[in-house]
Amino acid sequence: MRSVFLCVLCVLCGEISLAADLLPLGKLPPGKVVLVLQPHHDDHTTDYGMGGLIARFVDEGYDAYYVRASNDEKDGSHGYARNDMINLSESIAATKILGMKKVISLNWRNDYTGPIPLNELRAQLILLIRKYHPDVVLGHDPWEHYQKNPDHRNVARAMAEAYWLAGYANVNPEHLKIGLQPHTVWYLYGKARLDWGLGHRPNIDIELNDSEVKKKELAYQTHRNVYASPGSARAMKVALARENLYVPEWEGLSDQDAAVEMEEWFMEWISRQRGALAGVKYAEDYYFLDEFDYLPGLKDYLRQNLVKLP
């Protein structure tokens, strides 16, 4: 089976080497609600994604909500309207595997977040923050420098601003008329793709257990419109045949089952690679901000001056 991924490994080994230094293991912060703000239906459990951390939040008692900003109409081969319906259905099924409570769709046009006024998208995210009162916001790293996907860039930027501004009463004061009060979010986790370039770096790893990795794998497989589809296995077989290669484990399997096996292997592999960077079995890496990261030097000041109450 591993021969299938030689070409993938050649690319990803470069990614792993970019982060060769061990990262510290982070503990989950205190809280009850995590709001996952993403552009697309599948960004929670892509190969570089956050499904393991979401599953761990749920395991530790958090309520988790998923926001997809776009309608995902371009993701798949069934035409815009049907792609939208299939991808929403698969997103609901996948997030249930992770234990999430709800999928909230903003339904902006897929691959069209550039023309959207940033303050309009930001206002929607602020409204959701004020409605669901998250302790933690999770999404793409808004400060990563090598993000090719425009929806990822734009939604991440809106997320970063909403995370900061949702606590200010003078920002979107119209929300008060529908009973939504300002709400401060203390913790932010940002996820970046390091295989696209050496950009903004993660500063912690979050350890995952076997069950959380398995949930991530199952959620990833659920997105068969774009990931674990028969077409991906057929394309791989054609590419290997050109090199006079094949995968013995695929003999007797349908293209669908072969695709699922391939995705299972890769999701376990990437979680293991991340774990190796922190000296544990499985992990995911993130750029993390906590309640003391707002001002430069604040942590050093607190470290020098804090005293425990008697």
For each predicted feature, which ranges?
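Short, low-complexity, charge-dense intrinsically disordered segments
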Residues: 1-13
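Short, well-ordered beta-to-alpha junction loops that form the rim of enzyme active sites
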Residues: 108, 139-142, 192-193
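Acidic beta-to-alpha connecting loop that harbors the catalytic carboxylate
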Residues: 41, 143, 223
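Active-site rim/loop-helix segments in enzyme catalytic domains that contact anionic ligands
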Residues: 18-131, 161, 168
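C-terminal accessory domains and tails appended to enzymatic cores
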Residues: 21, 30-31, 168-184, 191-310
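Active-site adenylate/phosphate-handling loop in enzymes that bind or generate adenylated species
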Residues: 130-174
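Stable alpha-helical elements in mature extracytoplasmic
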Residues: 50, 87, 121, 125, ...
